[in-house]
Amino acid sequence: MKEVLLITGSSGIAAATARLWAAENLVFIVGNNTEECKALTELVGEAAFAAADVRDELAVRNAVAACLDRYGRIDALFNVAGISARSAGDGPLHECKPAAWDLVMDVNAKGTFLMCREVLGVWTKNNQAGVILNCGSVLAQSPDRGFSTIGYAGSKGAIEAMSRSAAAYYAPVGIRINVIAPGLVHTPMSARAQADPQISEHMVHKQPLTKGMLSAEDIAKMACFLLRRDSSPMTGQIVTVDGGWTVSA
């Protein structure tokens, strides 16, 4: 039987994971960019989508209901939708604007919380096992002065702590919750970094295994492993995929 993955986001890591998962299974995409969601759905084939803002509790509830209406069940959830709020004023702690902090926490941390809450509600009601993978960041574990965005790092740290706490609670009923923590990845969100020659040079040394930024496909491959039954003994883990970031000066 094909397994159903509910995934948030429609570009970058989300798009790469959806394409890889849909080669053998079913995908339901949740995102706030209708055109991107539609294009990705058409590209991967075995997929459907619902346009929704993950910060909105009712929109999240409706999106999960739409997935259930379409496929009858949800086997796995990958929360990858997120933002960087640098353009809104995120930065070093003494410079970070409160509005930027609120925005990035709202999208990244609250959005992940709401999606987990809704899907876990379905699973616990139906006595169903399942797997959740949330998206953290290497910046929550191994900070770098050149990437000092306190709001973003804080939001990812919140996701990691929430995931581990929830994993402990739900493990006895067969629900697994893990985190994937990418290094710097070549996605639309990292466009500013991609355009900066100094950052590009720094990343050659910071992520020596990839000689720079990781690809979205690098993360998607590990994500699919963590979402499949192949990883069934794992829960409460933060799996770092960083091209060598954490072991490089």
Segments predicted by a language model, with ranges:
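Catalytic loop of short-chain dehydrogenase/reductase
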Residues: 83-84, 133-158, 163-164, 168-172, ...
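Short C-terminal tail/terminal secondary-structure segment
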Residues: 84, 224, 235-249
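Catalytic Tyr-x(3-8)-Lys segment
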Residues: 198-218
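Conserved glycine-rich Rossmann-like NAD(P)H-binding loop of the short-chain dehydrogenase/reductase
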Residues: 24-39
